[in-house]
Amino acid sequence: FMQPVGTVFYSDIELLQLVEKINVLHPYAFYIVDTLGSMYRNEVSHRFYLIDENMHPDILLGFHGHNNMQLAFSNAQVLGKIQTKRTLILDSSVYGMGRGAGNLPTELITQYINKKIQSRYDVTMVMDIYDEYIAAIRKEYEWGYTMPYHIAASHVCHPSYAAYLINKQTLTMKDIERIIQSIPEEYKVLYDRELIEQLYSQFQSKKIDDTASVREIEGLIQGRKILLLAPGKTLVSHGQTIRDFIERERPYVISVNFVDGGYPADAYFVSNHKRMDILGQENRPLKGTRILLTSNIPNPGWEDYLYVDYDRYTNTDPMISDNAGLMLLKLLQRCGALEVFLAGFDGFQEDQENYYSEELYFQVNTNDIEEKRGRIQKQLKEMSRTMKLYFLTPSLYQGEEAYV
């Protein structure tokens, strides 16, 4: 089998030159490979005819499609209708299982062939495979069409760029598209992690002098205990503990990237474009509450907000560089805080709902959960050397830090 990755990037001359070499090698099969899932019907059929006319008749011709733009099935139908003496191979997988946006679903193409070409496949056997094996795998691993993969394919970019930006969990779809559009042409096809990290940082970066804001925050927290609320499920399971603490200690309460009327907050810290959009769309009752915004967030036109420098409060670890909780703790360190109480900082877990509210849910890359959790825990341990951290609710981040 010979599969030229990214067939769409071959010119006609380059493809014909490759076919000449294939005729010499004489493999079992040669493929059209839609690596980015960006090829339309006319592009696939054009390459088919070009190869079919010039390749040795004994060599089979295959098609390997990806579903970034939901085109794998339609392209397979086009090839299935072409009149040719050559044997055609259509790669497929049950339920489209495959990396990222997935591949051509076996159940769709076999049913199509049975109905429109010739009845030759037992589709119920495919369904049995799904029931016995794929359904369980699907619960553990994500694949299939998503908007970011569509954006990557529409700009003819490697899907891993989209995957990286999705996993940041801080960007709107418009943000993701802007960053992907900024990828230089020569870097689009082959994934460059360092490049996308750099472009993401540049997109988020907006340096400002936040001295005045820091001084004002110093005044707000002076002489008061500080309680940070994150949107973990323990906000519900340990709600009474939190409310009792607030009533007893009268702390300065800061909510991290979410709003909940059930807990009276003195301030909201927002560092995330996606969370900002949610707050704006819901038209939350924010009057009388201070809004602490990082400088990467556009001016919302709200009253009573303070901007702080985004760059200053990120850290050097790219996996958790702009974790909101860590950023806020770094800000409070700069403001002179000596101890901070934490609630709802549960830590992500696989196969569990990690947020107390469905509207706060963002998909988590299960492959990174344990690694990310360990890195956050390491940062918290470093911070606890100069600022005491007390977990008011159970947390997977707990190490040597205290638990109240």
What are the residue ranges of the model-derived segments?
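Catalytic cores and adjacent flexible loops of soluble metabolic enzymes
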Residues: 1-211
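Metal-ion/cofactor- or nucleotide/acyl-coenzyme-handling active-site neighborhoods
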Residues: 208-404
